[in-house]
């Protein structure tokens, strides 16, 4: 039996109606570039992705928490964020199929 990938479903509200859509890797990258924020779970780890402006420049935040341990990282671009090996020497791309939302 072939291994099936877990689908990540994103829910959002538009004009008071709730929509659901599969969150593919390409859509995830698009939404990050469009200033959407995310929260994922990986085993017992919470992964929050956010953005803010620092001196008029957009920066991306990666906040990782597991119990009392918390890590907060700042990146200058989506490419830097998704390629950084923050998860046991793996990047977001490497762990994409393991993430749950």
Language model features with spans:
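Short linear motifs embedded in intrinsically disordered, proline/glycine-rich low-complexity segments
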Residues: 1-5, 60-66, 101
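A short, sequence-level motif marking secondary-structure junctions
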Residues: 20-23, 50-58, 78-82
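Short linear sequence elements within intrinsically disordered, low-complexity coil regions
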Residues: 21, 45-46, 65, 80, ...
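Mixed-charge, Lys/Arg-enriched low-complexity segments
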Residues: 4-13, 70-101
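Negatively charged, low-complexity tracts enriched in Asp/Glu with abundant Ser/Thr
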Residues: 2-41
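Amphipathic, interaction-prone secondary-structure segments
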Residues: 29-65
């Amino acid at each position: 039996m072939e291994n099936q990938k877990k689908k990540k479903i994103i829910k959002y509200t538009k004009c008071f109606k709730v929509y659901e859509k599969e969150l593919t890797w390409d859509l995830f990258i698009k939404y990050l570039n469009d200033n959407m924020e995310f929260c994922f779970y990986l085993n017992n780890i919470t992964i929050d992705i956010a953005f803010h402006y620092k001196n008029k420049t957009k920066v991306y935040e990666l906040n990782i928490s597991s119990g009392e341990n918390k890590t907060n990282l700042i990146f200058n671009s989506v490419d830097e964020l998704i390629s950084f090996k923050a998860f046991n020497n793996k990047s977001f791309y490497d762990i994409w199929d393991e993430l749950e939302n």
